[in-house]
Curated annotation (Swiss-Prot):
Protein purpose: Protein S19 forms a complex with S13 that binds strongly to the 16S ribosomal RNA.
NCBIfam families recorded: rpsS_bact
Gene symbol of the encoding locus: rpsS
Keywords: Ribonucleoprotein, Ribosomal protein, RNA-binding, rRNA-binding
HAMAP family: Ribosomal_uS19
Family to which this protein belongs: Belongs to the universal ribosomal protein uS19 family.
Stated name of the protein: Small ribosomal subunit protein uS19
């Protein structure tokens, strides 16, 4: 169930403050964050966030298509190593 339009998108205020400080800078720094729950706002476009996945910070460059999604969607927390592959030498003919 989506969030109410009346309430607006959720975002941590400290992220918006950091983005607005870097707005006019030529060399933008990576913004390190643990806030996976924050919605990506249009003001975040063009910035790089290092989103924590529980182990390391993964750099995420924000583009227009990401607006409206959550930061955590672009920083996977689980690693998929694949299913076991059967050894073809052992198979009976």
């Amino acid at each position: 169930m989506p969030r109410s339009v009346k309430k607006g998108p959720f975002y941590d205020n400290h992220l918006l403050v950091k983005v607005l400080k870097q707005k006019d800078l030529k060399n933008k720094k990576v913004i390190k964050t643990w806030s996976r729950r924050s919605t990506i706002l249009p003001q975040f476009r063009g910035n790089t966030f290092a989103v924590y996945n529980g182990r390391v910070h993964i750099p995420v460059y924000i583009n227009e298509d990401m607006v409206g999604h959550k930061l955590g969607e672009f920083s996977p927390t689980r690693t998929y190593r694949g299913h076991d592959k059967k050894d073809k030498k052992i198979q009976k003919k």
